[in-house]
């Protein structure tokens, strides 16, 4: 039986810790301005899909952030191992969160409707 409460709790802890690690431990300029928005865990806690956003809308900055996060994965996992009491630290997969951009686009469309 899968304990969804534990999965969600571990996901929230990983989200909090990864945000803190990116701010304090990772010195790569490519990941400056990256914010972790959500973490989805696999049922056995072996894989964590980490969703992130970046302040810039430029495609080149998004690509650089993705590369920077992939390069920093080892450091992030090591720090997670120090800070979390888990049997095995999950493998991390970083995915750009498109939901904020989508929401901004809808807000803009609604504002344009109000003007007309």
From Swiss-Prot:
The answer on whether this UniProt entry bears the keyword Transmembrane helix reads no
Q: List the GO molecular function terms.
A: ribosomal small subunit binding
The keyword Transmembrane helix appears for this protein: no
- GO BP, sorted A to Z: maturation of SSU-rRNA; ribosome biogenesis
Entry's family note: Belongs to the RbfA family.
* HAMAP family, per database record: RbfA
Name by which UniProt lists this protein: Ribosome-binding factor A
| Species the sequence originates in | Streptococcus pneumoniae (strain ATCC BAA-255 / R6)
